Amino acid sequence: MTADPRVINTAYPIDTLSYVEATELCNFGAKVVYPPTIYPVCIKNIPILIKNTFRPEDKGTIITNDNGCDENGRAIKGISSINNTSLITVSGLSMVGVIGVNQRIFTTLAANGISVFLVSQASSENSTSIGMRDEDAERACEVLNQEFAKEIEMGAMYKMKLERELATIAIVGENMKHTPGIAGKLFGTLGRNGISVIACAQGASETNISFVVERKLLRKSLNVIHDSFFLSEYQVLNVFLCGIGTVGGSLLEQIAGQRQQLMKERNLQINIVGIASGHNAIFNRNGIELSAYEDNGTFSIAKLRDGLKQADPSDLNHLHDEVIGMNIFNSVFVDCTASADVAGLYEDFLSNNISVVAANKVAASSDYENYARLKETARKRGVKYLFETNVGAGLPIINTINDLINSGDKILKLEAVLSGTLNFIFNTISADIPFSQTVRMAKEEGYAEPDPRVDLSGKDVIRKLVILSREAGYRMNQEDVEKHLFIPQSFFDGSLEDFWKNLPSLDASFEAERKQMEASHQRWRFVAKLEHGKGSVKLEKVDEHHPLYDLEGSNNIILITTERYNQYPMLIQGYGAGASVTAAGVFADIMSIANI
């Protein structure tokens, strides 16, 4: 088979192998054929047919002298591994240019009955690394230290370095020599998934590329390689989802509805490998079957939520350990909560080559050092930390700012309405509907927080402005933003009950000001502004000539003034709130990770 099916459930039978390929695979752990049995039939050019005794009707694998590609044009025939590997490194400055060092190494090992299956030496000759089975490692170290005792004592060589808990992997295919880029593809795939290669070797025949990794990364390595070389018609993206409230639930509905289309048109397979919500979680490294939660043929988030209640209990530590411990390739953690504790896990995930997509704006608006550290960790590890929906839900605001800056433009000014709640309130207030009633309406219709003072304080807008300012290249924290309250501080100090009781006392002053504004053709807008590196949020009056004047309902709008878009700023406008558009923005971030 292409790989060990006990490790890779997508492994499948190989149609044809050459004698050389079969021998290479057997030497590296494939146990179906005993290597010494191949030689006699090879010299007589007798084909070998391997069949499954439990499924004799299957085609099986035929071994011949033919060394061509398989029927799908793949140069790689199979992947094999040895999981009990130890690596001994013989090193020293005196080894350079000295004849006979390697002869002494291998003569000593052979004299002590120690077999070696991997040798790696750079052209500098400063060191030679030797791979062998764990049971031989201690003895090999001992006899090599004895052999080179004089050089070690003189300081010309170092004591043998022994590394344990390793595994050796080999990719095999005679046609690799005719296919440029195999090694590049192999090591590039490993690197993108955070897998470091400790030693590697390739013979001049180019039939086998062998390399050593940490044993704990063996399963991940095999899956990554197999997916890259044998399942290339589908790119697999493994998703961990935390939070299945309105946004998370809508995201799952969108993924379930689009999954087949993505496989057909984009060759992208999205596997949901973990779902956590509240105190429960379910994990499956092969993918959670969303079809198990269908109602009349359609995915039901309500059914999933009911099923999750019966799942194993989970807490933050369990979530952290499962996501990292699953050690799965091409993975992304999606946070659809508002939890600061969940946001605190991002750095560990990024450090373990797990991309992060966050609808949660806590991390991106936290202290600047934390924000910068997350961005830098993602950059160094070659993964993504994306949070487009932190500002403007599904509106492409952050991506647009990033594109402008990456193309050499400079952000000079941002002017925006970023609170759908406040825009709804100030669009709804009228002679018939006083200010206090519009606040109640915003809460009842789901725009406002359960405690609407969170919205009225402008805190959420400040967070969004801080995020935009940072993405625009400015170092800013929340306390740096100048804030102007439009209701007295006393309304924020008391209880929520007192707030609702006293809120109507503001109606008269708001109505008097509204009448004056109406006569002057003005409207209220709660504006977030970045100018000359300074941020501010306040309630402003705009006239009918201002771009913010006609903003309807709970929509958001942003004006971006740059060196290039100077006289006429770029304008982005649309729904800035709502579960479905926010989920669509999260989905778009996930898709951009699939495209890297």
For every predicted segment, state its role:
Residues 428-429, 436-550:
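Substrate-binding/catalytic subdomain of NAD(P)-dependent oxidoreductase enzymes
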Residues 67, 77-80, 107, 469, ...:
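Short beta-strand elements
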Residues 379-382, 386-445, 455, 459, ...:
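Rossmann-like NAD(P)H-binding beta-loop-alpha module
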Residues 238-244, 248-351:
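N-terminal glycine-/serine-/threonine-rich beta1-alpha1-beta2 phosphate-ribose binding loop
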Residues 170, 413-418, 423-426, 441, ...:
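Catalytic, metal-anchored helix/loop core of enzyme active sites in primary metabolism
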Residues 38, 106, 187, 252, ...:
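Generic hydrophobic/aromatic pocket-lining and core-packing "Φ" positions
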Residues 339-352, 361-388, 393-401:
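Rossmann-fold NAD(P)-binding glycine/threonine-rich loop
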Residues 1-235:
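C-terminal catalytic "cap/lid" subdomain
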